[in-house]
Amino acid sequence: MAAPVIIVGSHVWVEDPHLAWIDGEVTRIDGINVHVKTKKGKTVVTNVYFPKDTEAPSGGVDDMTKLSYLHEPGVLRNLETRYELNEIYTYTGNILIAVNPFQRLPHIYETDMMEQYKGIALGELSPHVFAIGDAAYRAMINEGKNNSILVSGESGAGKTETTKMLMRYLAFLGGRSGVEGRTVEQQVLESNPVLEAFGNAKTLRNNNSSRFGKFVEIQFDKNGRISGAAIRTYLLERSRVCQISDPERNYHCFYLLCAAPPEDIKKYKLENPHKFHYLNQSSCYKLDGVDDASEYLETRRAMDVVGISNEEQEAIFRVVAAILHLGNIDFGKGEEIDSSVIKDKDSRSHLNMAAELLMCNAQSLEDALIRRVMVTPEEIITRTLDPDNAIASRDTLAKTIYSHLFDWIVNKINTSIGQDPRSKSIIGVLDIYGFESFKCNSFEQFCINFTNEKLQQHFNQHVFKMEQEEYTKEEIAWSYIEFIDNQDVLELIEKKPGGIISLLDEACMFPKSTHETFSQKLFQTFKEHERFAKPKLSRTDFTISHYAGEVTYQSNHFIDKNKDYIVAEHQALFTASNCKFVAGLFHALHEDSSRSSKFSSIGSRFKQQLHSLMESLNGTEPHYIRCIKPNNVLKPGIFENFNVIHQLRCGGVLEAIRISCAGYPTRLAFYDFLDRFGLLAPEVLEGNYDDKVACQMILDKKSLTDYQIGKTKIFLRAGQMAELDARRAEVLGNAARVIQRQFRTCMARKNYRSIRNAAIVLQSFLRGEIARAVHKKLRIEAAALRVQKNFRRYVDRKSFVTTRSSTIVLQTGLRAMIARSEFRLRRQRKAAIVLQAHWRGRQAFSYYTRLQKAAIVTQCAWRCRLARRELRMLKMAARDTGALKDAKNKLEQRVEELSLRLHLEKRLRTDLEEAKVQEVAKLQEALHTMRLQLKETTAMVVKEQEAARVAIEEASSVNKEPVVVEDTEKIDSLSNEIDRLKGLLSSETHKADEAQHAYQSALVQNEELCKKLEEAGRKIDQLQDSVQRFQEKVFSLESENKVLRQQTLTISPTTRALALRPKTTIIQRTPEKDTFSNGETTQLQEPETEDRPQKSLNQKQQENQELLLKSISEDIGFSEGKPVAACLIYKCLIHWRSFEVERTSIFNRIIETIASAIEMQENSDVLCYWLSNSATLLMFLQRTLKAGATGSITTPRRRGMPSSLFGRVSQSFRGSPQSAGFPFMTGRAIGGGLDELRQVEAKYPALLFKQQLTAFLEKIYGMIRDKMKKEISPLLASCIQVPRTPRSGLVKGRSQNTQNNVVAPKPMIAHWQNIVTCLNGHLRTMRANYVPSLLISKVFGQIFSFINVQLFNSLLLRRECCSFSNGEYVKTGLAELEKWCHDATEEFVGSAWDELKHIRQAVGFLVIHQKPKKSLKEITTELCPVLSIQQLYRISTMYWDDKYGTHSVSTEVIATMRAEVSDVSKSAISNSFLLDDDSSIPFSLDDISKSMQNVEVAEVDPPPLIRQNSNFMFLLERSD
């Protein structure tokens, strides 16, 4: 790798003994050595240094391949920066690095976060474990390949939790929602707590360390659904069962069982954990924050889910308890040499308990522990073990039982979950131990590191393959990249024969082999191997140089731990156990051992398992997750550099970086390269060159070689980036000096101008003072002249005004006298005319009133007489049920006669009106004649007055004294005429008084008649109710008769008797006839004929309903803004009284019609049409219907059209125009406004119809809202991030800054304008269909809430969106939405603009300047009061200024936010920083009813199909 180009002033990284790497500034260069002044003030001289990127984002980068300098200190600093911001995930290409936060971060693992990452390409959102899972799942679905996810890291790095999150996400993608019972994904997820209970334990480095490796194969069918799974485990740490060190713990299951409920503890004969030898070797019995009792119950529940029955669970925990009792069996020396016996009673008691739990003989168990049987050709020898060997036998038995119990649990889980032989593909999740290097490394560490060597080789090949694919994709020339291959280490370990494992197996097969002989064999075999070494101070230790460093192994227990056999006495003991579960474990083992006669060791079997694992991984597309433990104290907020670097090396991350650095470590997109280094060649930017050509010209100008230009990126060798940065720093330094020079020049010029301006101001002041003195003198002289002139004018004007006032007073007195005389004459004349007019009008009105009252009294008397007669006839007819129908027919005939008489009365009344009109015309002619005479007299008087005025004026011209000229004759005649008129006036006044008395008496009589008429009206109502009840009885009797006739027809074939029934015809309401119909049929009797059959009532009603449904199924539009269909349905239902019946089908048929119209409907116009109709109809029902316990009981004054003909005629009498003068007889028509709608006590079908209609209204509303969301959602993806401007903008932006800042370019807001266009389209559609403004405002309110949620969540999940320029872009788009809200008016938008409060405040925070000066209180109370502390913390840590280079809020504010977020995380149930979309219904029926204006139902014209039918003539009625 070429040395980076460094100049004085460059910032570099140098090694530090405390921080691993520290940054500083180069102060001097001496050959290959540089002098660096670190940030601590210390000067370091070194030749090992790396350039530092001073322009790196303050919050780090989410993909370390984006680092300008890809080296160890850059990677370490980037991880540390992101860890401080709680950004625990970081990409390195396709590799995910996960740093354990050691605290709960539930908000990034909730279901809504899974929804965000579902189907999103890798790298589009912030790094996350869900993104890796989604990438594997999408690759499997799209390419049909098997995929695997390898999770690695040292103990405590978070591998187990990461694996659980991966499995949760895969179950979320491939799960089956709504499936009853145990699903495959549930069983896979619940297998984790079971395996953790039996395979995890507390270690020095981790409270929940997995002591085994695990590979989970999740199988998927062709639809991408989980169809099966298999779990493979590797190398369980068996020695932990018997031996633990302080402060570690044994496996969790032992402590869980000791914390079980009291009944279980009694059942398994357990005590406190500190009383068991296998547990009390350590002082740690409990874990912080873990309740073993609840974990025990949770484990039992998980075992139920994975398919382990209650009997099997009981057997499992009996075995676990037996192992604890086995550990408490101690041995003492026996009587014989090298023999042993049970030490004491306590040990004997535990022996008996263990035997009881294992259901075997206690003596047999004792013999199996302390005796061995040796078979020779001559005899069978039984020998006793000494106490030490007996303890070893006990421990061996415990380890054997536990390991096979663990294997049984794994096999049971696999059997329960089941594997799908027809699965299309799999995703494997590998959770395996990371590289280990301790002070004491035994056989377990040897196997673990062997595994990691295998995985590292696979990892290196994968990284090399990714590099090769990147170069091939960009179509650049590349050569082979060398990388360290660890094949020699693998051969050292696994070569057969001659490898360490082979030599270990060989030593195990010889009984006399020891660890010394085994070590000597290794030293002799590998003394020349580069990767093998012998420590100087040990005879049995050996050292292997792994890829992550040298590890020294202690071979003391290699042979013992490698042996995989079971003692024959142990096997015989448990095979004879009465417990089928225990016997089954050892029986299966016996079958396996009998099938294989070769020697089997742990190492060989592990090597075979590892070989099988690598074959599986090689057949899949791998995805890597490297887990990092930031510190060894397991606390949050601590980042230990040396510890992390060691793990990066062990995890192969630095090796992957080294492979990248061996090729082209720096890769920049053309746009980014020009944006950063375009200033090195300004003439290139000013030219109209393609981006690729421009980049080529810049590199050629700087004489760089050995770089590559791909299709979209530039690939630079190591060191070339530093060289370009050095030249860029030089250019920027020169530019800074030019700016400083120009600034100093500007300051000097500014100082000179200020001095000059001060002198000018002083001179101006002095000249002004002189000018003001001269001006004052001239002003005094002018004022004196002005005073003299005004005084002379005042004296002359006062004399003139006095003369003029005297003249005016004289003239005014004369003219007033003349006017008063003329006014008196006119007032007398006007009074006479008014008296005459009132007297004549009173006479005419009195005559008309008498005629009207006489006619009404006559009509009322006659109607009362007829009503009484009909009542008597009805009472007589009611005594005989058989004659009831005849009475009804006669009654209807009588009513017909009354109708004819009514016509006659109308004609008489018309004649009276005509006579009255003629009389009034005569009176008007007489009045007109008198007015003409009055005008002539008035004209004569005026002429005489004019002549008198002329004479007076002529006389005044001769003589100044006034002369009064009197014509005595005329005055006398006028006086006589006035006297005569006064006499007439007095006589007329006397007559008027008499007429007034007569009028008062007539009013009294009229009131009496009104009371009588009101009493008659009440009686008529009572009669109508009686008739209605009788008619209902007739209808019920007719129904019974019909049923009887049908039964008779089924018995007898003859039906001739039915032909003798009287025939009736249907009389409908027409403009020529004044009869009525209510949609059902009204029948009038006619002469009986046998030619015209009668239609049944139900059939006719069915036809009317069919016609109504056929009409509303079409789009019949609107009438003056009112939905015709809703008004039509409402009027028909009211007229047919459908709301008041117990059973009817019309409601269900209307609902079915609406459902068929909107089913699978994508046309917004149709949905809005039915939304308007449904809302209007619901408004009618809300104001009309009221729930009642009985039938449709309404007040007589407000009931609808009666069903009988007599009732309808009576109702028409009360509502006739002739009765307009009597309010108590005026009926209420259904055609009035909503204020006149009558209240109906609805039955159950009507109330159910209202509920169904409400449900359909909400459904249509939801369909319109979801359709709008579907249209807007694709546009929002382009609205959250500013589109990249073309390269020409880099130049034009410098010269046209002002204009671009004022008005955003049209292409930049095109996506926002598309949203506005979509909103306008839907608004026009809803307004064209007269959708209520409340519903429109609610729709747009929820749409704006959806926009707020989508934009805000995207902003929090994508760091590239949290930039200054992106904030300006979104703010410009929001301004477009605000303008649209203003144009659409508040009536239709409501509070929609307020729904964007989260994104508005977030964007406002992004674009404010001087963020570091803002305190947390100012941010939370003034800038962003709506945002939560988690959301503010997320935005503050992700913010980066790509325009001005400013920083986010201060570190103190960040620290305070982090502390508050931590507190909230501990206390809150859900502390997700993401918003949830609200899909509820935001209105109620009362809201709709209150918001809608009154609708005149009667003013709506029915469609032609209805208008042409005579049964619907009631729809043509109009309200007065």
Curated annotation (Swiss-Prot):
Q: Where is the IQ domain?
A: 732-761, 755-784, 780-809, 803-832, 828-857, 851-880
Result of knocking out the encoding gene: No visible phenotype.
**Organism superkingdom:** Eukaryota
TM region positions: none
Q: Which residues form the Dilute domain?
A: 1148-1463
Q: Which GO terms describe its biological process?
A: actin filament organization; actin filament-based movement; cell division; fruit development; Golgi localization; gynoecium development; leaf pavement cell development; mitochondrion localization
Q: Name one Pfam family in it.
A: Myosin_N
Q: Where is this region: Actin-binding?
A: 492-526, 528-551, 586-610, 610-632
Give all residue intervals belonging to the Myosin N-terminal SH3-like domain: 7-56
Q: Which CDD domains match?
A: MyosinXI_CBD, MYSc_Myo11
- Give the Myosin motor domain ranges: 59-729
Q: Does the keyword Nucleotide-binding apply?
A: yes
What keywords are assigned to this protein?
Actin-binding, ATP-binding, Calmodulin-binding, Coiled coil, Cytoplasm, Motor protein, Myosin, Nucleotide-binding, Repeat
Q: Kindly give the SUPFAM superfamilies that the UniProt entry links to this protein.
A: P-loop containing nucleoside triphosphate hydrolases
User: Which stretches does UniProt call biased (Polar residues)?
Assistant: 1076-1086
Provide any one GO MF term from the record: identical protein binding
Q: Where found in the cell?
A: Cytoplasm
- Coiled coil location: 881-1047
Where does the UniProt entry say this protein principally localizes? Answer: cytoplasm
Instruction: Specify where the region named Disordered lies, as residue ranges.
Output: 1062-1100
Please give the family membership noted in the entry. Belongs to the TRAFAC class myosin-kinesin ATPase superfamily. Myosin family. Plant myosin class XI subfamily.
Anything noted about its domains? IQ domain mediates interaction with calmodulin.
Q: How does it assemble?
A: Homodimer. Interacts with MYOB1 and MYOB2. Interacts with PHOX1.
- What is known about what this protein does? Myosin heavy chain that is required for the cell cycle-regulated transport of various organelles and proteins for their segregation. Functions by binding with its tail domain to receptor proteins on organelles and exerting force with its N-terminal motor domain against actin filaments, thereby transporting its cargo along polarized actin cables. Contributes to the trafficking of Golgi stacks, mitochondria and peroxisomes. Required for development of pavement cells, trichomes, and stigmatic papillae.
Name by which UniProt lists this protein: Myosin-5
Q: Which organism is it from?
A: Arabidopsis thaliana
Q: What is the lineage of its organism?
A: Eukaryota, Viridiplantae, Streptophyta, Embryophyta, Tracheophyta
